[in-house]
């Protein structure tokens, strides 16, 4: 069904009419418009002139922004590094890339094998994927939207700073968007196809669509939702169960064939998302032994994710920066979506298709993703469809006031958004760092925390044996820079030091990298990613000399490489023992046990009582800061040091406090007597006798 809409005038007046014959024909629906309800019909708008020129302009703009903002480094997120590493492992026969989605890693594996880990080349492929996605989607939906809505849906997507950033990345989202566009390009003509279901043309459409759906699911696990969405649409809106069953059959042909390949070649017997589905139910993704989400907990998760993605990130894509997610905005979007679906003016098969697809895909995303992950790339892949849906509703509502008001209103609002996003892109252009990156400087443009961390990782790759196990928090990024594997430790293991040691011993960890990676990558605050630091605390509580500093980088936000020591250094190498205690204080500065041992070492091994007092005072300061009682060994060693410095009176004052707190401790009584033997010989003699008596009683 083709209609002439007031929106067509916006372009036809400016550029003239274009003959219908200039567009590829789409077969009419099996039923006539008279017998089929309007909302089940894929309405087509009168074609407008020069659409290819406009689409080319959008693509040129997106390419220009992507090139100007090109970043030759991998991102600090880590997932994009995983795809590259997985591609290398897949090509070398090490492992099948089954965690984040396999297709992107499989697709780039020949290029990684040919060129090595050459990030700029891989990012050029992502730019091509992004451009192709916008182009193919534009071709696929141009018949079903008013021209103004069509062009701005594509243009605002191309201009979104996050989209430009993603286009020049090694994440799988650009490929996902290309496959998504391919699905829409194939599915919409299939809906109106009149040929028999077993005809050559129908089978070609169905097999192509089944392959695209399978590859989408293989790219990101949420892609399985696309098949569900299309089947729901065919059954509920189109009432075409034959095509629905045929589409499912086509999908499972490819799914089953690939499952057989995985089992025979790689020994993989489960679907790639099975592990994620089990972890989806966890309250804390990084605590497998923790609580499972309840039904109400999942509902809360969906609502919170909807808030942060639709009422925070979505406005940000359009240049509207929010301080926090807006419940009011989310409520408006939900109400507007319902109105668009059910309003007679906007209700059509195409709007129902968009609604069905977006509800299923966004719903699956909001249900499966932990709230704290909060990654914009999870929803930006749906940005052009969201824009098409809501701009169409806005255009129709304004056109009800005046035939030209829809075009004017959409143009003004989208023009302002385009101004904001383009300005944001221009501000993010950094030609100096790009030039350095392309000349081989992998670190140019990194924030100090990441610069320190990756320099340490690179040093470890160059100086440590390949057989060593190095634990760190961001292993994928580390491997890209060091060209060697790392062990990722992402969670806090236990409050029990023995359990933490058991984990590190079980993993045979030889070295540990600790860095101050910012919790907020854009701003340095006191908060940093510290789960691995807390694990180090537990190691140090059990053995204060377990960390030996090998290398560090950075001053304001440093990173450290430690060797994990399991030897008895106190007996075998006293000086190395002292250095290890000092190294532990870098990470755990208020470790009373380490400070006490260092104070004793200064007294007994170095004969440096001033250093002993310094360590004791540091421990006392930490105790006062935290409003804790001062451990008596700290006071004892301080008093001993003060005595050796020639101040028995002050030392006696401290030992007096200790003896009063624990009158049956012969050591305190003896030391007090020792301090008083010149100042008060009589009392000192009595205390020596008491200390001797207490010692005999305790034997």
Give, region by region, the residue ranges found by the protein language model.
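Perimembrane helix-loop-helix junctions
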Residues: 9-10, 20, 35, 39-41, ...
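Membrane-lumen/periplasm interface segments of specific transmembrane helices
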Residues: 65, 243-331, 335, 361, ...
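Extracytoplasmic catalytic/substrate-binding loops of multi-pass membrane glycan-assembly enzymes
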Residues: 71-84, 95-110, 117-120, 267-274, ...
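Multi-pass, polyprenyl lipid-linked donor-dependent membrane glycosyltransferases
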Residues: 78, 99, 122-129, 152-187, ...
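Transmembrane-helix signature of polytopic, membrane-embedded enzymes
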Residues: 134-159, 177-178, 199-200, 406-407, ...
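Hydrophobic, aromatic-rich transmembrane alpha-helices
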Residues: 135, 235, 308-351, 355-358, ...
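Hydrophobic/aromatic-rich transmembrane helices and adjacent perimembrane loops
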Residues: 166-167, 173-179, 216-220, 225-228, ...
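Transmembrane alpha-helical segments
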Residues: 393-396, 410-450
